[in-house]
Amino acid sequence: MPGGNTRSVLHVPPFPLTIVRGEGARIWDADGHEYLDFLGEYTAGLYGHSHPVIQAAIRQALADGTTLGAPNRYETQLAAAICGRFPSIELIRFCNSGTEANVMALSLARAATGREKLVVFEGGYHGGVLYFHHGGSPLNFPAPFVVGDYNDPAAAELVDRDTAAVLVEPMLGSGGVIPGDRAFLQALRDATRDHGALLIFDEVMTSRLAWGGLQDVLAITPDLTTLGKYLGGGLAFGAFGGRRDLMERFDPSRPDALPHAGTFNNAVLTMAAGAAGLTQVLTPAEIGRLNALGDHLRERIAALGVRATGYGSMVGLHDVEHVFFGMLERGYSYARRGFVALSLPLTEEDVDGFAKALAAELA
């Protein structure tokens, strides 16, 4: 592997920790050191490590066979659970990552509208080929993107009769955990409706912040929503869904059906783990409890004079990269850039311990 790496974000000079085991909110590295996990696998680890309910579901699915090459009983369970949570998702299709979900949603928008132009935002991250930090990436999905300023309502003026879709995170994740202003997001909703373009909310990270995602908190209904991360129960997962008239374009019984392939779109283990997590573990009350912990952590950090952004259980620490290794030595793991995503096993005592350790490092 080039540089010993197959996932760029995990590279931390001089070398990253190699984690060999996880249980609850704790992880252990190859040298036997123990850490409290405040990274939460960049929001994918919402359930913590080795949750017994999800483990049991995976074991049962594994015993029944995995590569069946056919529809399976778990995919309908997971589809029903997700559609039941998100009123804007009338129909859904599964894929293998948030990246894939966003590529498919954009491709659907272009096919449905017959237009090409796509509006995105500085700081937006929608996957490995949809990266819009500081001018974007040479590996980006080839399309005529127009990049606007996040949280600037005037960016809605970029939407015109040539626009197929606007793709936006209701809160920037990789771009600093910056909540979207409602006025900004509503302006995008109004502009897309006025010009016949589609509004796509990337809730790959943010769907965990409310039972109906941030779109429910904001009371703004997108045409399409993309999902990923924790919804696969800790296994590789992506999904996109939305308005029935749009998603029905993938109905294979139609003579004009749009193709959507993928060997592992309905991978048995992922479908089983995802369904178990959503129907047996995650509840609105648990989301609220974890969000309250995140709010508490932000308050504790802000009291130290550190800028702490985010919403609920997602927290962004700014300008504290210099204390990262010290925090590791104190037993706290999170992203070097300051990204924190809490998991369900964490407690108020754990959160207070993180804040105290940060205070000691900053002293």
Residue ranges and their predicted role:
Residues 1-363:
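Conserved N-terminal phosphate-binding loop of PLP-dependent enzymes in the Aspartate aminotransferase
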